[in-house]
UniProtKB/Swiss-Prot annotation:
The protein's assembly and partners: Component of the telomerase complex.
Superkingdom to which the source organism belongs: Eukaryota
Similarity comment: Belongs to the EST3 family.
Compartments where found: Nucleus; Chromosome, Telomere
Stored InterPro entries: TPP1/Est3 (IPR019437)
One Pfam assignment: TPP1
GO biological process: telomere maintenance via telomerase
One cellular-component annotation, GO: chromosome, telomeric region
Protein name, UniProt field: Telomere replication protein EST3
The protein's role, per its UniProt record: Component of the telomerase complex involved in telomere replication. Stimulates RNA/DNA heteroduplex unwinding which favors the telomere replication by the telomerase.
Alphabetized UniProt keyword annotations: Chromosome, Nucleus, Telomere
Length: 202
């Protein structure tokens, strides 16, 4: 594991950005939302896929749960499908997935990588990303609690976490050329820091 002085998160590595951008082909026009099936599986990536649950966002109409996850340097939008992720988690641990899990570390055992259109992202997920950015999200199918301790990040550390969608390497793949006229990264961080009435995170 790399020691990162600027982002001193214990038991945490930075793998999100490189792993996600490595799966997106700039020259391919995706006709399906799925970018990579089994993007995370026992043998799919070289680094252990540990992420921190920064916060839960909204519950969708199909009872899936959306969230913001992070490694030591970047954040990404994720969704936990009710079936199988939430059902299996709550059977395994005998409590709701939102109970004492924000700010804890999870091990992603299986996940797909897929695009979500901006309309769905806004109406169903409660997040607005600039229209000219194609948004790839983690569809987490199976997870385990890696470290249950809810360790709050300092404000300075969390502020240094960057949404992958605004990283230059991601924009080179998924950004569009037209002028930006929507929310920037600062405004996005304000949106995702809000509390949502339909999700209880203890």
């Amino acid at each position: 594991m790399n020691v990162n002085i600027k982002y001193p998160l214990v038991l945490h590595d930075n793998w999100l950005l490189e792993s996600i951008t490595g799966q997106i082909n700039k020259n391919v026009k995706y006709t399906n939302s799925l970018i990579k099936k089994d993007f995370i599986s026992p043998s799919s990536i070289s680094k252990t896929p540990i992420l921190r649950i920064l916060r839960f966002l909204k519950t969708t109409k199909s009872s899936d749960l959306t969230a913001i996850l992070s490694d030591s340097t970047h954040t990404v939008i994720a969704i936990f499908p009710f079936d199988p992720a939430i059902i299996n988690f709550e059977i395994r641990y005998k409590h709701r997935i939102t109970y004492h899990t924000p700010n804890s570390l999870i091990l992603i055992k299986q996940a797909n990588l897929r695009f979500v259109n901006n309309v769905e992202l806004t109406t169903e997920w409660g997040i607005t990303i600039e229209d000219e950015i194609d948004v790839a999200v983690l569809e987490v199918l199976d997870l385990e609690i890696f470290q249950r301790d809810q360790i709050m990040l300092g404000v300075n550390i969390e502020n240094n976490l960057q949404l992958i969608y605004y990283d230059k390497s991601y924009l080179n793949l998924c950004g569009k050329s037209r002028q930006r006229d929507s929310l920037g990264e600062k405004e996005i961080k304000e949106v995702i820091s809000q509390s949502y009435d339909d999700v209880v995170s203890i």
